[in-house]
Amino acid sequence: MLILTRRVGETLMIGDSVTVTVLGVKGNQVRIGITAPKDVAVHREEIYQRIQRGDEPVASGAHHGDDSSN
């Protein structure tokens, strides 16, 4: 596992087309923004596990939705 340190507003690149930006830190929560091509699925781990089990349908464009869990 690669471990990186980033400050609020800083970004890291995954390959040539995915960016992950630290948007904010509050207590033990970190808000991140992810920019990825539409053909790259981005899910929180618990949602990904549900999809793998077949418990949750894969929504079209789900990685572009708003995660309003603050």
Swiss-Prot record:
Please tell me where this protein is predominantly located: cytoplasm
Q: From the Swiss-Prot or TrEMBL record, state where the protein is found.
A: Cytoplasm
Gene3D superfamilies per record:
Translational regulator CsrA
The source's superkingdom equals Bacteria
Please name the taxonomic classification of the source: Bacteria, Pseudomonadati, Pseudomonadota, Gammaproteobacteria, Lysobacterales
Into which family does the record put it?
A: Belongs to the CsrA/RsmA family.
Write the signal peptide boundaries.
none
Q: Please indicate if the UniProt record lists RNA-binding as a keyword.
A: yes
Assembly notes? Homodimer; the beta-strands of each monomer intercalate to form a hydrophobic core, while the alpha-helices form wings that extend away from the core.
> GO cellular component annotations, sorted alphabetically?
cytosol
Q: What Pfam families does the record tag this protein with?
A: CsrA (PF02599)
Swiss-Prot/TrEMBL GO biological process terms: mRNA catabolic process; negative regulation of translational initiation; positive regulation of translational initiation; regulation of carbohydrate metabolic process
Q: Briefly, what is this protein's role?
A: A key translational regulator that binds mRNA to regulate translation initiation and/or mRNA stability. Mediates global changes in gene expression, shifting from rapid growth to stress survival by linking envelope stress, the stringent response and the catabolite repression systems. Usually binds in the 5'-UTR; binding at or near the Shine-Dalgarno sequence prevents ribosome-binding, repressing translation, binding elsewhere in the 5'-UTR can activate translation and/or stabilize the mRNA. Its function is antagonized by small RNA(s).
What is the protein named? Translational regulator CsrA
SUPFAM superfamilies according to UniProt: CsrA-like
Q: What is the organism field in this record?
A: Xanthomonas oryzae pv. oryzae (strain KACC10331 / KXO85)
Q: Which GO terms describe its molecular function?
A: mRNA 5'-UTR binding
Q: Which UniProt keywords apply?
A: Activator, Cytoplasm, Repressor, RNA-binding, Translation regulation
Where is the region Disordered?
Answer: 51-70
